[in-house]
Swiss-Prot record:
The mature protein consists of a small and a large chain linked by disulfide bonds. Keywords: Disulfide bond, Seed storage protein, Signal, Storage protein. CDD domains: AAI_SS. One of its GO terms (molecular function) is nutrient reservoir activity. Residues 22-38, 75-94 form a propeptide. The small, basic, water-soluble napins are one of the two major kinds of storage proteins synthesized in the seed during its maturation. This is Napin-B. Pfam families: Tryp_alpha_amyl (PF00234). Belongs to the 2S seed storage albumins family. PANTHER family: 2S SEED STORAGE PROTEIN 1-RELATED, GENOME ASSEMBLY, CHROMOSOME: A01. Residues 1-21 form the signal peptide. Cotyledons and the axis.
């Protein structure tokens, strides 16, 4: 009797584990290191050319750098944990109320092909991240890098880029490649 009870229990446990395992699905995403990938952030050659012609989105780089260096306790155009641009986007006075540097960045992004907006923003973000690294900014570096990519992620929405609302940059763990 104990043998049958054990066999039934083991069978039920096996089926439970089998059905439970089939419910969950693991998604593995590879974030290639752009430093070792010759294409870098530009999977589309046309985007690399646009990035170079746009002088590497200089105004956007300056805006990203400014946002990275500010703490979360600034005006509404800075980051405070979550993205604060959305409150200002609904300003009925429109884009003329944007800070001039942000407006220049938006102008640069509007000149890009919609397909290239995110790759060029990723290139600009990487350039800013490297600038911060070269400046030797150790204090709060992880937060600065996070603010760079968080700002860049939402810039298409802030700038009202057609066909692009956000750039889905993957968050990567900090490593020696900083």
């Amino acid at each position: 009797m104990a043998n049958k009870l054990f066999l039934v229990s083991a069978t039920l446990a096996f089926f439970f584990l089998l059905t439970n395992a089939s419910i969950y699905r693991t998604v593995v995403e590879f974030d290639e290191d752009d430093a070792t990938n010759p294409a870098g952030p530009f999977r589309i050659p046309k985007c690399r050319k646009e990035f170079q012609q746009a002088q590497h989105l200089k105004a956007c780089q300056q805006w990203l750098h400014k946002q990275a260096m500010q703490s979360g306790s600034g005006p509404s155009w800075t980051l405070d944990g979550e993205f604060d641009f959305e409150d200002d986007m609904e300003n009925p006075q429109g884009p003329q109320q944007r800070p001039p540097l942000l407006q220049q960045c938006c102008n640069e992004l509007h000149q890009e092909e919609p397909l290239c907006v995110c790759p060029t923003l990723k290139g600009a973000s990487k350039a800013v991240k490297q600038q911060i690294q070269q400046q030797g900014q150790q204090q709060g570096k992880l937060q600065m890098v996070s603010r760079i990519y968080q700002t860049a992620t939402h810039l298409p929405k802030v700038c009202k880029i057609p066909q692009v609302s956000v750039c889905p940059f993957q968050k990567t763990m900090p490593g020696p490649s900083y």
